[in-house]
Amino acid sequence: MEKSKGYVSERELREGLIKLDNALDKFILMAIYNRIVGKSGMSDLINLKKKDVDFKNHFIKVGKWQVPMDKNFEKITKEAIEQEYYYLEVNSSYVAEGYNLNNDSEYVLRTRPKSRNKNGTAPLNYDGLRNKVRGLCAKAGLELNVSQLETSGIINKMLKKKSDWTVLDVELWLRINNIKVNAYRIYTIIKDING
């Protein structure tokens, strides 16, 4: 498959995740790719709680629906929940700089403990997450925004079903799966990928 602007395959996403140091950061990008975003300002991702993750049945509960986890997504999710130290960067002396996370937080996404965020137990805010995603995509070598990352995940699921999609097929599949995105845009990206 050729690379289409504004799209990454699952393989390309995994290659990008290797460049990230923190399981929490990998989880953020994987969650968006798997449509854990929300209607307004990534609210589903921001408010995702540890109790919403069901490792026994391999899914994440998001509102009224369940997001299945493959082995890789499940591994990253488990590592993100268990992560205790957040690495900012490794300096020139190969000393890792960062901070301890507050694992008493009920949220999967935890912030740097400060008084303004209840010592790291309050949920991340939208602006903070949006800026983080922008930086993570750049570090991972993915030239995407949140919408493009989410759309890439949708397209990846569709291409696993079949490769020859018509606009009507796309519209029907999106409607059946209750996904509200521009069908023609999805169709043109699939057409571009298939050459």
Please give the residue ranges for each predicted region.
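DNA breakage-rejoining catalytic core of tyrosine-based enzymes
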Residues: M1-R14, W65-I76
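Short, basic interhelical loop/turn and adjoining N-cap
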Residues: K49-D54, N125, I176-R185
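Alpha-helix N-cap/helix-initiation sites
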Residues: D21, K39-M42, Y126, E143-T151
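Short, basic (Lys/Arg/His-rich) helix/loop patches that form interaction surfaces
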Residues: R130-G195
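Basic, Lys/Arg- and aromatic-enriched nucleic-acid-binding interface segment
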Residues: E10-S40
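Short, flexible/disordered intra-domain loops and linkers
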Residues: K114-L124, K162-L168
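Basic, alpha-helical nucleic-acid-contacting "clamp/cap" segments
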Residues: K61-P113
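Short, charged phosphate-coordinating catalytic segments
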Residues: M30-N57
